[in-house]
Design a protein with these regions (language model features):
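A cross-kingdom marker for long, charged
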Residues: 167-199
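Substrate-binding/catalytic groove segments of enzymes
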Residues: 155-167
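A structural signal for well-ordered alpha-helical segments within the folded catalytic domains
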Residues: 62, 143-155
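Alpha-helical cap/lid subdomain in secreted, periplasmic
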Residues: 1-143, 164
Length: 199
C-alpha cells in the first residue's frame, strides 16, 4: 500500500507468527502496484487522492523498501514489473471508452486491454434490483498481469531466467508473452534490493 499505516501496525505480528512456526524460512515481501491510470483515485487531471499513478508507485515502493529494511528482507518486485510494462508498452493506456463499454449486455464483457496489465471488467448482481451491473476493476491484475506476476515469482523464488519459461496461456500470444517475460526478468534482475540473498 502507498499508505504505510495500512500495514505498519500489522506486519510485525505476522512476522512474529512466521518466525515462531517456521524459524528457518526466508521472509520475502510481495510488492504491489499502482492502479490503472483510469481509476478515479489516480486519474488525471484531478485524481481524488491528489496524485497520479506514478506517484502512487513511488509511495508504495518507498513503504515496501522501509519494511524490507526493517526486516532485512528481499522484495518480490511485481510492482516494478508493472511499471516497466507501462513504460515499455508500444502505446500509452488511455482507458476504455465509456460509451463503448455501456453497449455490452450481460454476460458479454469488453475485451481486455492489450496494453495495461491492471484492470478488467466483470458482472455482479445488484442485491436490491436483481439486475446485472458491469463493474470495472482498476486495481487487480488482469490475465496478462497475472501471467507476468507468475513469471516474476518463478524467476525470483527459483533463481531462473526468462529463457526457462516455456508455458504460454492460450489467452496470451507468444509475442505478448515474450514482452511480459522480458518485463518480469528485468524487474527481478534490476530492482535494487535492500538485502542480498547471500547475506
Amino acid at each position: 500500500s502507498w499508505q504505510s499505516d495500512k500495514f505498519d501496525n500489522f506486519y510485525p505480528r505476522l512476522v512474529e507468527i512466521i518466525r515462531k512456526h517456521c524459524p528457518k524460512s526466508e521472509i520475502v515481501i510481495q510488492q504491489t502496484w499502482s492502479y490503472a491510470s483510469d481509476d478515479p483515485r489516480v486519474a488525471k487531471p484531478s485524481p481524488t487522492w491528489g496524485f497520479d499513478q506514478d506517484e502512487m508507485y513511488r509511495r508504495l515502493n518507498e513503504n515496501y523498501r522501509n519494511m524490507a529494511k526493517a526486516l532485512n528482507a528481499r522484495i518480490i518486485p511485481t510492482g516494478y514489473a508493472v511499471q516497466l510494462s507501462r513504460e515499455r508498452a508500444p502505446e500509452k493506456y488511455t482507458g476504455f471508452d465509456k460509451a463503448d463499454v455501456s453497449r455490452y449486455v450481460h454476460p458479454d464483457l469488453p475485451p481486455a486491454s492489450p496494453i495495461e496489465v491492471v484492470g478488467s471488467f466483470c458482472w455482479h448482481k445488484d442485491s436490491k434490483t436483481g439486475k446485472y451491473v458491469m463493474w470495472q476493476d482498476t486495481f487487480h491484475l488482469n490475465k496478462r498481469g497475472e501471467y507476468m506476476q507468475a513469471c516474476v515469482w518463478y524467476m525470483f523464488l527459483f533463481g531462473r531466467t526468462g529463457a526457462d519459461i516455456r508455458f504460454v496461456p492460450e489467452s496470451i500470444t507468444k509475442e505478448d508473452s515474450a514482452f511480459l517475460i522480458g518485463c518480469a526478468e528485468s524487474a527481478v534482475r534490476d530492482y535494487p534490493q535492500v538485502r542480498n540473498l547471500k547475506e
